[in-house]
């Protein structure tokens, strides 16, 4: 259910794009992200920092898209967000000796310390590559194709990555 909730702004963006076009869809994405954060704050009293980052990025890049009437900015938004995630993973590990992947998932699964480190690096690389793929699609395909990729392609890549990661991690998981 959380996965679908996380997709809420993307799904609304997709639907709004199909009905009204990129500029209305961009405004919808900004509002949907605000609503998502308000709901999380109301229900859980604590909003994940990455949701705040997402709101900041969608507001800045979406706002630029709307003010300048240029869809290039909203097309850069996923890449900037993916790269921000990648930088956060690497900087938290190198500068603060904190593994964010372990901090997020450590209560659900038990892994050797070295594997947590590898997992963090693999996620950072994945986000860099996904950002590059987003730019490739944004600059080489139509806006309609990019919007389809944003919902189906990027989400599909994430699902395949998580399944592959789960298979790889299964051999390291300690029995409880």
Swiss-Prot record:
Presence of keyword Cytoplasm: no
Location(s) in or outside the cell: Cell inner membrane
Keywords, alphabetical: Cell inner membrane, Cell membrane, Membrane, Transmembrane, Transmembrane helix
Top-level taxon of the source organism: Bacteria
GO CC annotations, alphabetized: plasma membrane
Transmembrane segments: 24-44, 49-69, 76-96, 119-139, 149-169
Pfam family of the protein (one): IspA
Membrane topology: Multi-pass membrane protein
Keyword Transmembrane helix appears in the UniProt entry: yes
Biological function: Plays a role in cell envelope biogenesis, maintenance of cell envelope integrity and membrane homeostasis.
Family in the record: Belongs to the YciB family.
Annotated protein name in UniProt: Inner membrane-spanning protein YciB
UniProt organism field: Paraburkholderia phytofirmans (strain DSM 17436 / LMG 22146 / PsJN)
Name of encoding gene: yciB
